[in-house]
Regions:
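Enzymes that bind and transform nitrogen-containing heteroaromatic metabolites
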Residues: 1-213
Length: 213
């Protein structure tokens, strides 16, 4: 049965999953990359960049789990790019270049419709402007027997969790405090939403917590 998951989502000790002032130069916001220091050295992440080498320990195991087994992805518009408002043209095709790491249908939430973009490696970006539930329906259909990943950003994850749509959440808590940014957990009563901890794995760079219903 298809499950909807949040996976590999970095969070600071004070609950922020992105920094302030996202821009082309700072796609994760100011200091936002600090919550993902656990993933950058892994073999899985380096392969996503087309590079060799990388670490193969516990962090890599979680990084691999965060990308494998998914038949469709859902992204908020910020996860696709820094452009705001109407699309000025068709030039911007995502943060990852011509061959994004999704390799599956990827549904981008937006208020502004845009034709699908077919990329190298099996990724096609579909732009959904009629709500999170319609996007999830499309993603489930596209995923077939595989799972659907809610890839972020912060507000997109919060909306799907609050709507009761997410079966499993993997958070990687970084040992740093951002002080400010986009809060992931503020106002979310995970216990009331039915989540319990099913996995808890500390590493040198993060503490991996997996919650499930």
């Amino acid at each position: 049965m298809t499950k909807v998951k949040v996976a590999g989502f970095g969070v600071s000790l004070d609950g922020f999953a992105a920094g302030t002032t996202q821009s082309l130069g700072h796609p994760l916001g100011l200091r936002g990359e600090e919550v993902f220091q656990w993933v950058f050295p892994t073999r899985t992440f380096r392969q996503m960049l087309g590079k060799e080498g990388g670490e193969t320990g516990l962090d890599d195991r979680f990084a691999r789990r965060a990308m494998e087994g998914f038949g469709a992805f859902i992204l908020g518009r910020n996860m696709f790019g820094p452009v705001r408002g109407e699309w000025p043209d068709d030039q911007w095709k995502g943060w990852w270049g011509d061959n994004p790491p999704y390799h599956a249908p990827t549904f981008v939430l937006t208020h502004y419709p845009r034709p699908p973009i077919e990329m190298l490696g099996g990724t096609t970006f579909h732009f959904v402007s009629d709500g999170i539930l319609h996007a999830l329906q499309k993603a489930r259909e596209a995923a077939g027997a595989k799972d659907v990943k809610i890839g972020g950003g912060v507000e997109t994850v919060r909306q799907y969790v609050q709507a009761g749509c997410v079966d499993e959440i993997h958070l990687a808590f970084a040992p740093i405090a951002l002080g400010q940014g986009e809060s992931l957990l503020s106002g979310l009563d995970l216990r009331a939403l039915g989540y319990r901890t099913v996995e808890h794995v500390p590493t040198d760079r993060a503490t991996h917590i997996v919650l499930a219903k």
